[in-house]
Amino acid sequence: MSIRAEEISALIKQQIENYQSEIEVSDVGTVIQVGDGIARAHGLDNVMAGELVEFSNGVMGLAQNLEENNVGIIILGPYTEIREGDEVRRTGRIMQVPVGKELIGRVVNPLGQPVDGLGPINTTNTRPIESPAPGVMDRKSVHEPLQTGIKAIDALVPIGRGQRELIIGDRQTGKTAVALDTIINQKDEDMICIYVAIGQKESTVRNVVETLRKHGALEYTIVVTASASQPAPLLYLAPYAGVTMGEEFMYNGKHVLVVYDDLSKQAAAYRELSLLLRRPPGREAYPGDVFYLHSRLLERAAKLSDAKGGGSLTALPFIETQAGDVSAYIPTNVISITDGQIFLQSDLFFSGVRPAIDAGTSVSRVGGSAQIKAMSKVSGTLRLDLASYRELEAFAQFGSDLDKATQAKLNRGARTVEVLKQGLHKPLRVEKQVIILYALTRGFLDDIPVVDITRFEEEFHAWLDSNATDLLEEIRTTKKLADDDKFAAAINGFKKVFVASE
């Protein structure tokens, strides 16, 4: 069998005609320096600020410093395998995280990867972690209440859906407990909660997850964790990942609560990155744009207009102070960004007043308009009662011969402090808060011994569940105070069966 030359040439021609060349062009640079989670690369001339880049071993990085002859990159993962001379290529993408209802009930890292051992998260939706906050015309005034279940907050510093309320205090003053109680209280409220743990011990995060699971709150909660052992870039990105996951629900008309625990550690991580990138340091060695770090995060919390679906994203940022110093750089920055703050004081905490909320310095700038009418009526005099009690308490230590009016104020104040105390993970429905505060402010508790107030309240709530369900239902549905006669009948009815301790 002989093969003719023309057949061979015809076959070659056919192969040439069918040949398609796919040339993949990518911008490639070279690592010239690496260490401490930072790499510098030469040759990435067209890279965007905030663009994802990929190292030759598959680890991703984020382009941050665009300089004349090199690019400063923060490495999002282990950096020990990256060497000088390694290749680094542009991806053309900016940082995105997975979003959607598939994340609910899961524990993820700031890149959206699951860390709870429950398998992969089956979602294809993603959102960029840096996105502009809603504009003025896309927003609406805060008018719906977000019930925390904590009497001292719902009565004195009410929070509305779409508000930013700072929780500030020293370490070990119960900041995380306030957030967990608020999340637990959102059961049956059609609220999605996101808890962002920044720079915490992994054992602490584990305890938080178990607490949420025990109270059935993990069914509507996403936990984003960047623990203390993780590189600084992940601590810096964690809050942005959390708010991005929340925005997906907000723009779909849902209500979201995001807790950032805590932003002091994020600021410290950002300071570390900035100093390693050789950015000029400012006050307390923080970079000049540390205010923008927090403002662009917290401005993404909003109550959207009806045209945008009417969703909301409420932010509860935490700041840890040193020895109660709220005039430091980061605390003053975040106080000026938020719509109010709740101060937790260590001396109150250690004296047994828990939650240790300082009513004098805590304020809510927009939450008052979101408070239900019943609550605003019964809590009107609380702040004054507490303030005059604290003032008179100091004088009462010097003299024993006090007039009747002063003694009455001291007695009312002592009972107010007792009523505002609350057990850990025992959030209270708003209708029960209204009734006990009504009893307090209208003088029904003045003849109950101070030592019995807590027991009186617990037994009263149980009694209401079986004997005054119609009164509870009326407050819950109308959100207004019922007739004084109904309240008096319920409170006096219970006082008849309550046995005071000797």
Curated annotation (Swiss-Prot):
Membrane topology: Peripheral membrane protein
UniProt-listed Enzyme Commission number(s): 7.1.2.2
InterPro entries to which the protein is assigned, alphabetical: ATP_synth_asu-like_sf, ATP_synth_asu_C, ATP_synth_asu_C_sf, ATP_synth_F1_a_nt-bd_dom, ATP_synth_F1_asu, ATPase_a/bsu_AS, ATPase_F1/V1/A1_a/bsu_N, ATPase_F1/V1/A1_a/bsu_N_sf
Main localization category: membrane
Enzyme class: translocase
Gene3D superfamilies: 2.40.30.20, ATP synthase alpha/beta chain, C-terminal domain (1.20.150.20), P-loop containing nucleotide triphosphate hydrolases (3.40.50.300)
GO MF, any single term: ATP binding
Catalytic activity line of the entry: ATP + H2O + 4 H(+)(in) = ADP + phosphate + 5 H(+)(out)
Start and end residues of each stretch annotated as Disordered: 115-135
Pfam families registered for this protein in UniProt: ATP-synt_ab (PF00006), ATP-synt_ab_C (PF00306), ATP-synt_ab_N (PF02874)
Site (Required for activity): 362
Subcellular location: Cell membrane
Keywords for the protein's UniProt record, in alphabetical order: ATP synthesis, ATP-binding, Cell membrane, CF(1), Hydrogen ion transport, Ion transport, Membrane, Nucleotide-binding, Translocase, Transport
Entries under PROSITE patterns matching the protein: ATPASE_ALPHA_BETA (PS00152)
GO cellular component, one term: plasma membrane
Positions with a binding annotation for ATP: 169-176
Record-linked HAMAP family: ATP_synth_alpha_bact
Function: Produces ATP from ADP in the presence of a proton gradient across the membrane. The alpha chain is a regulatory subunit.
Subunit structure: F-type ATPases have 2 components, CF(1) - the catalytic core - and CF(0) - the membrane proton channel. CF(1) has five subunits: alpha(3), beta(3), gamma(1), delta(1), epsilon(1). CF(0) has three main subunits: a(1), b(2) and c(9-12). The alpha and beta chains form an alternating ring which encloses part of the gamma chain. CF(1) is attached to CF(0) by a central stalk formed by the gamma and epsilon chains, while a peripheral stalk is formed by the delta and b chains.
Family recorded in the similarity comment: Belongs to the ATPase alpha/beta chains family.
Protein name: ATP synthase subunit alpha
UniProt organism field: Bacillus anthracis
Gene symbol of the encoding locus: atpA
